[in-house]
Regions:
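N-terminal helix-turn-helix DNA-binding core of bacterial DNA-binding proteins
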Residues: 19-60
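C-terminal regulatory/oligomerization modules of transcriptional regulators
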Residues: 124-148
């Protein structure tokens, strides 16, 4: 059996591999996919981001983020929407087509994870989910500390 740090490392490497494969599937570079993924996560959480927030997250200038957003919009992956609270500003959204492509591509992995999760007892599931959430908190903390 693998020790815990190695198992977590293997999980991170596997997740990175999924992102690389998904980026290729969408015809994107890994860095462009990273931007798209951030927009999707922000959108899912109900806190959509604009180009300025995306630039801050990626550690790039606003001008570079605008070029990136333009590229993703031209490719049909992102759209700009006026913000309800300030129509002079925009937030970014992943297009429905791209969202469907991502969901279709990830469906086999999601189904397998669901199958594995269902094979656990309720207590095991709770323990694993709690542990994974704590790992996520630690990883987010590390990435927040490293942010410019």
């Amino acid at each position: 059996m693998t020790d815990h740090p190695a198992a977590i490392w293997h999980l991170l490497i596997a997740a990175t591999g999924v992102n690389v494969t998904l980026a290729r599937h969408l015809g994107l570079s890994v860095s462009d996919f990273s931007a798209l993924d951030h927009v999707a996560q922000a959108q899912e959480s109900g806190s959509p981001v604009g180009p300025t927030e995306l630039a801050q997250h990626l550690g790039m200038t606003s001008a570079s983020a605008t070029v990136l957003v333009d590229r993703l919009q031209t490719a049909g992956h992102l759209q700009r929407r006026p913000r309800a609270d300030d129509r002079r500003r925009v937030h970014l959204e992943v297009t429905d087509t791209t969202r469907e492509q991502i969901q279709t591509h990830l469906a086999p992995v999601v189904n397998e994870v669901h199958r594995l999760t269902e094979s656990l007892t309720s207590a095991e599931r709770e323990t694993v989910l709690n542990y994974l959430e704590r790992i996520c908190v630690a990883l987010r903390s590390m990435s927040s500390a490293a942010a410019p």
